[in-house]
Amino acid sequence: MIELKENERIDYMLGEQLKIIQDGQSFAFSLDTLLLAYWAKEAIKNRSRVVELCSGNAAASLYMAAFNKAHYDDVELQEDMVSKARRSVELNDMQDRITVYQGNVKDAGSFLRKDSYDVVVVNPPYFKAPAGHKLNPDRSKAIARHELEINLEEIIAVSAGLLKMKGKMFMVHRPERLGEIINYGFKHDLAVKTVQPFVSRRGQDANLVIVEAVRSGKGDGLVLRDAIEVHEADGSNTPAIKEILEAKLPEEKHYFYVLLCSDGSFYGGYTNDLKKRLEAHNSGKGAKYTKSRRPVEMIYLEEYADKRTAMQREYWFKHHDRAWKEKFLHEQGVKF
């Protein structure tokens, strides 16, 4: 049972597919966060290692993790945000995939492995904090919005240090800081390759950009994409934004399958990726039983919406003798 503290509530993302703990008194995730997560997720594979810097309550990582099986490390300075992030991760049963660290992003290289991440995602403080500048009296909100604990160059330097060669950084920021992002990127071996602007309404100046940069990438070939409109004339979200906010999670399919081995025996198994599993069996990496009985042929399969049922069918098939298996397969119209 996840406990909520005073002023906390549970909000939803992706319709009602994800839950997240927020506090009406502190900084909540915004559309900026979801736009960043939506763009970055396209670069993330199931085996990717991803780090989110300035992660807040882990909204971006939760969103991205819903679309793949990658592992995420989140770094957030503020204790109250870390608490909400960790409980939100638990609320969505993602403890084995998202790890939340409390610390200053400047120090991330001391507790995260350098040169090891495929993707860095960051929604940094947007505004500088010159002497005498009036800040939000709420310290938590001031830190989230202004460069009080870390500045833009430091964030880019840390991002570059964590990325593998050719790894990608995705950053959401204000257009007026774009020149600095490009400059600091070159300085720290991060070549900006794509800039995606967003406008509140067509005809207005951009008020947000998402930048994609590549570590040790070539300095030429920057693509400035057509601006995406956020709001219709009546103030409602455009179809492009609705797609991001209400995107449906991919439905994972689960299979019970039967292989015919080279010695004429049968092997029953479970998978959620038929092609990859068959390739594994025929390369000798699928199972101890099939390793010495290659090549194998998939002769029967059943599809299920849940993993448990498919694995029960695997167990059921394996615990019958040869005669029963032959009879079962013949009844299903399988010729062998």
Language-model features: where?
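Class I SAM-dependent transferase core
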Residues: 2-44
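Short glycine/proline- and charge-enriched loop/turn segments
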Residues: 17-18, 134-143, 291-296
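Short loop/edge segments at beta-strand edges and connector loops
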Residues: 22, 102-103, 173, 196
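Conserved SAM/SAH cofactor-binding pocket of Class I
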Residues: 40-122, 128-133
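Mobile active-site "lid"/loop adjacent to the S-adenosyl-L-methionine
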Residues: 124-154
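Conserved Class I SAM-dependent methyltransferase catalytic core
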Residues: 148-206, 210
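SAM/dcSAM-binding transferase cores
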Residues: 205-251
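GIY-YIG nuclease catalytic motif and its immediate N-terminal context
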Residues: 250-287, 291-323, 332-336
